[in-house]
UniProtKB/Swiss-Prot annotation:
Residues 23-44, 217-302 are annotated as: Disordered. It comes from Homo sapiens. It is found in: Secreted. This is Stanniocalcin-2. Homodimer; disulfide-linked.
Length: 302
């Protein structure tokens, strides 16, 4: 139940958070014709939008965040690349030497990949989003994001804002990678996001946190069922041992037992005859059969 509510709530939050920016984009940049309108309905960049991005990428410089700014206004609503770049540059002075080197190399790697890959993929929005997510991951891992985060955890935490996680997918990709950079980084980011969530949404975040912990808690077997399982195993083991040590009686012995029972009802010495018959069964087969016939004859005569 908590899982369903959590999923519904997060979906609603994302829809409400992105509704106003999307509406503002449509109002300020309306489609210029039927072709653009149909392109947006199919979930792909319009031809005009594609040409504008390509022209922007060619003219953008190699230094700064110009390449990422080319993707801020697009019909696929892929935003956040420029914001991440600006956040890294504004906080670069707080990083140590390793962190500054990471910022420089990672931003350059992302800009180079965007410039070369954009013209080689389709105009469909899912393909473009996948391309952006993949190149971000490649550049962050290539230049060791985790090493920079572990040495500059406090600065990394200050850069992450709760509202950005609701509005921009590139921020979500970045945080998901940071959560794999060790327990110290993970706990610091989780605590920061939780506090910001409570500041924005109040006690609702505590409910979501409780649901998440309940979902992640592994199920435990009911204690009352364990003795039943043990008793079943012991019973099966007992029957198995009994079956192993006690062989099943043969048909001949079964027949003699039945005859002995009939004899016990008619004569008090039937048990003695049963013992004699049992001793005779251990001898040769001819002697055993002869004694059986004599026993039957005496029973009939009586």
């Amino acid at each position: 139940m908590c899982a369903e509510r959590l999923g519904q709530f997060m979906t609603l939050a994302l829809v409400l958070a992105t509704f106003d920016p999307a509406r503002g984009t449509d109002a300020t940049n309306p489609p210029e014709g039927p072709q653009d309108r149909s392109s947006q309905q199919k979930g792909r960049l319009s031809l005009q939008n594609t040409a504008e991005i390509q022209h922007c990428l060619v003219n953008a410089g190699d230094v700064g965040c110009g390449v990422f700014e080319c993707f801020e206004n697009n019909s696929c609503e892929i935003r956040g690349l420029h914001g991440i770049c600006m956040t890294f540059l504004h906080n670069a002075g707080k990083f140590d030497a390793q962190g500054k080197s990471f910022i420089k190399d990672a931003l350059k790697c992302k800009a180079h990949a965007l410039r070369h890959r954009f013209g080689c993929i389709s105009r469909k929005c899912p393909a473009i989003r996948e391309m952006v997510s993949q190149l971000q991951r490649e550049c962050y891992l290539k230049h060791d994001l985790c090493a920079a985060a572990q040495e500059n955890t406090r600065v990394i935490v200050e850069m992450i804002h709760f509202k950005d996680l609701l509005l921009h997918e590139p921020y979500v990709d970045l945080v998901n990678l940071l959560l794999t950079c060790g327990e110290e980084v993970k706990e610091a980011i989780t605590h920061s996001v939780q506090v910001q969530c409570e500041q924005n949404w109040g006690s609702l975040c505590s409910i979501l946190s409780f649901c998440t912990s309940a979902i992640q808690k592994p199920p435990t077997a009911p204690p009352e069922r364990q003795p039943q399982v043990d008793r079943t195993k012991l019973s099966r083991a007992h029957h198995g041992e009994a079956g192993h040590h006690l062989p099943e009686p043969s048909s001949r012995e079964t027949g003699r037992g039945a005859k002995g029972e009939r004899g016990s009802k008619s004569h008090p010495n039937a048990h003695a005859r049963g013992r004699v018959g049992g001793l005779g069964a251990q001898g040769p087969s001819g002697s055993s059969e002869w004694e059986d016939e004599q026993s039957e004859y005496s029973d009939i005569r009586r």
